[in-house]
Amino acid sequence: MSTCLTVTKGIAISSLGLYAGIVSAGTLLVVNDRVTPTNDSKHDLVRTLLCKVGTGLNVVATVVFGLVYFSSPGYARHPYLVYAALTGPATSLYMFLSKRYWLKQLRNLKETKITDEKHSPPPVGQDAAQTSDKAEISYAAAAAVGAENGGELSESVVDLGIEKTIAQAEKDFEKQKADEVVRRETQSIKVRAVATAVIATVGFIQSVIGVSGEHL
């Protein structure tokens, strides 16, 4: 019985160690910006396989540590077995909840940006000043074109200049908004990866210390 439990503990610790290693390696790549979005099917396949392997090791470690705890006699049911068994569920639960939180934050960011841009009133005098400046610039440019061509200045030319200026400003705003969303999303991925790696590594280290302490 003792030999069987020892072998089972070895399997559980090895599974948890491999899981912690995969998570930590992935975290280092993410933090160092070595993982970039790609449409390459080979890279997607590798990521999918690593995720499946990590999930499998997580499940194996959780189940086996649980079996070891409940199969051991009362005096051998050490707390580290429970902590190690809860490492996998803790990382999974954290990833699930944190992902939902960050997705909600990103969604609120997008909606807030759009609402502020389309519906919030501008500061007093700002809208009139900007419109006046745009009109003067467009009028001056149109006047120069009209003078070169010997024609008369048309109001439609001025209006077109203002519309182009506003369209360019809206385009710049959309780009800034998209860049901010990407920055927030990248930050959330890094934070979640680091936290998951820390939880998995701490669970693995305490399980190794716990097993070593049994033989002292």
Swiss-Prot record:
Q: Which GO terms describe its cellular component?
A: mitochondrial outer membrane
Where found? Answer: Mitochondrion membrane
Tagged with keyword Amino-acid biosynthesis: no
Known PANTHER family for this protein? AUTOPHAGY-RELATED PROTEIN 33-RELATED
Record's family?
A: Belongs to the ATG33 family.
Q: What does this protein do?
A: Involved in the selective degradation of mitochondria via autophagy during starvation and at post-log phase.
In its UniProt entry, what is this protein called? Answer: Autophagy-related protein 33
Q: Which organism is it from?
A: Candida glabrata (strain ATCC 2001 / BCRC 20586 / JCM 3761 / NBRC 0622 / NRRL Y-65 / CBS 138)
According to the entry, what is the taxonomic lineage of the organism? Eukaryota, Fungi, Dikarya, Ascomycota, Saccharomycotina
As recorded in Swiss-Prot or TrEMBL, the protein's gene is named: ATG33
